[in-house]
Amino acid sequence: MITIALPKGRLAQQTVELLKRASLVDIDISEESRKLIIEDTQNSLRFLMVKPFDVPTYVEYGVADVGVVGKDVLLEMNKRVYELLDLKIGKCFVALAGPKGISEALLKKPDKTIATKFPNIAKEYFENVRGEDVKIIKLNGSVELAPILGLSDMIVDIVESGRTLKENGLEVYEKLYDISARLIANRASLKLKTQIDDIINRLERMIEE
């Protein structure tokens, strides 16, 4: 049986729908379900429902053979896992954003303060792309509040539609990275290469359609 770590929430549902279209599973996963382990015995698959930032850890240590996780998490955590496939779902992007209408002034400002859930991504971007040393404040949610309340000048965050930014008087200054869900594995998973290759091949056919 292959164990797959899935991030709780909408991405898990999207992944299962993709697996169903590829005739790999016969189960449904509800976003409201409290079950943490879900088995599809008919297809010899077991799903672990974990927090998105925990998916690479479960895969890295071999508790899960493969996992599905956003590219943003992989960029932030830099775990020893292998990207097998871009699933083309959960699409969004990482952006530098801030108060509307003053982007030029803030981008030129020295000693910037950046609030973000992704301190490593923010640090790498400012150091290696912009060549700047900035102060980074890590937050775990509602990052948009930081520049509104004066905690930071700007934010680095995930953007899907941009609606949340707009409703809070913010706008995208720069697009940093395109993000989508990735299928990942660890070195130990090579012992299941035949089964995993079958999953990859079937998913690739669905993605290309």
Swiss-Prot record:
Q: Which Pfam families match?
A: HisG (PF01634)
Q: Which GO molecular function entries does the Swiss-Prot or TrEMBL record give? A: ATP binding; ATP phosphoribosyltransferase activity
| CDD domains per the UniProt record, alphabetical | PBP2_HisGs
The record's GO CC annotations read: cytoplasm
| Superkingdom assignment | Bacteria
Compartments reported by the entry: Cytoplasm
Might you give the EC number(s) for this enzyme? Answer: 2.4.2.17
**InterPro entries per UniProt:** ATP_PRibTrfase_cat, ATP_PRibTrfase_CS, ATP_PRibTrfase_HisG, ATP_PRibTrfase_HisG_short
GO BP of this protein? L-histidine biosynthetic process
Q: Which pathway does the UniProt entry assign to this protein? A: Amino-acid biosynthesis; L-histidine biosynthesis; L-histidine from 5-phospho-alpha-D-ribose 1-diphosphate: step 1/9
Return the Gene3D superfamilies for the record.
Periplasmic binding protein-like II
Catalytically driven reaction(s): 1-(5-phospho-beta-D-ribosyl)-ATP + diphosphate = 5-phospho-alpha-D-ribose 1-diphosphate + ATP
Alphabetically ordered keywords of this record = Amino-acid biosynthesis, ATP-binding, Cytoplasm, Glycosyltransferase, Histidine biosynthesis, Nucleotide-binding, Transferase
NCBIfam families given in the database record:
hisG
The UniProt entry's sequence similarity note says: Belongs to the ATP phosphoribosyltransferase family. Short subfamily.
| Protein purpose | Catalyzes the condensation of ATP and 5-phosphoribose 1-diphosphate to form N'-(5'-phosphoribosyl)-ATP (PR-ATP). Has a crucial role in the pathway because the rate of histidine biosynthesis seems to be controlled primarily by regulation of HisG enzymatic activity.
> Subunit info?
Heteromultimer composed of HisG and HisZ subunits.
Domain comment quoted from the record: Lacks the C-terminal regulatory region which is replaced by HisZ.
Name the UniProt record assigns to this protein: ATP phosphoribosyltransferase
This chain's source organism reads Caldicellulosiruptor bescii (strain ATCC BAA-1888 / DSM 6725 / KCTC 15123 / Z-1320)
